[in-house]
Amino acid sequence: MEYEDVIRRLEALADPEAVKGMARFGINPENTFGVSMPNLRNIAKESGKDHGLAQELWASGIHEARILAGMVDDPKAVTGEQMELWVKDFDSWDVCDQVCMNLFDKVPLAGQKVFEWAERDEEFVKRAAFALIACLAWYDKTSGDEEFTRFLPVIVKGATDAVSYTHLRAHET
């Protein structure tokens, strides 16, 4: 699926009432269409993995396009530089969590990024560290306990963090 086709689909599925509801849950309503997650998943399934498309979607700055970018990107093509660029763009908890859950947790650098991002001050960058811990623990069925116990000091420190969305994610871990 081409970038223009995806954007047209998102525009056609726009729901202004959903945008109002999203704003009540702390989601930035700027550049947001209010497209449901099931619809985003369907578009991602139709699009398949496409690193180039993911880059275009992310660059659009559209809320749902960024979530979709995390769904269609190829984890094998993602670099540490891309992870840094995207994490700096996170402006809501749902984009952060969805990108971590659908893409970043499958990138070999995920564990390294946990330690780097947990030390940062930006709210959603720090939250991404804890979202990654949760995703790795949930989805990685092959690693042993030692793979996850290395994150315990990060979790303990984050559980007392005053940053609201980080605090929430640390308690969810």
Question: What function would you assign to each model-found segment?
Answer:
Residues G70, C100-M101, F130:
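Hydrophobic core positions within HEAT/HEAT-like alpha-solenoid repeats
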Residues G48-E56, A77-L85, P108-E116, T142-V156:
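Amphipathic alpha-helical scaffolding segments comprising HEAT/armadillo-like alpha-solenoid repeats
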Residues T166-H167, H171-T173:
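Conserved small/polar residues in nucleotide/adenosyl-binding loops
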Residues R66, C96-D97, K126:
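Residue-level detector of extended alpha-helical repeat arrays and alpha-solenoid scaffolds
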Residues R127-I133:
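HEAT-repeat alpha-solenoid elements in large eukaryotic scaffold proteins
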Residues A59-S60, D89-F90, E119-D121, T160-S164:
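Short coil turns that connect the paired helices of HEAT/ARM alpha-solenoid repeats
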Residues M1-S60:
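N-terminal alpha-helical scaffold/docking segments in eukaryotic complex subunits
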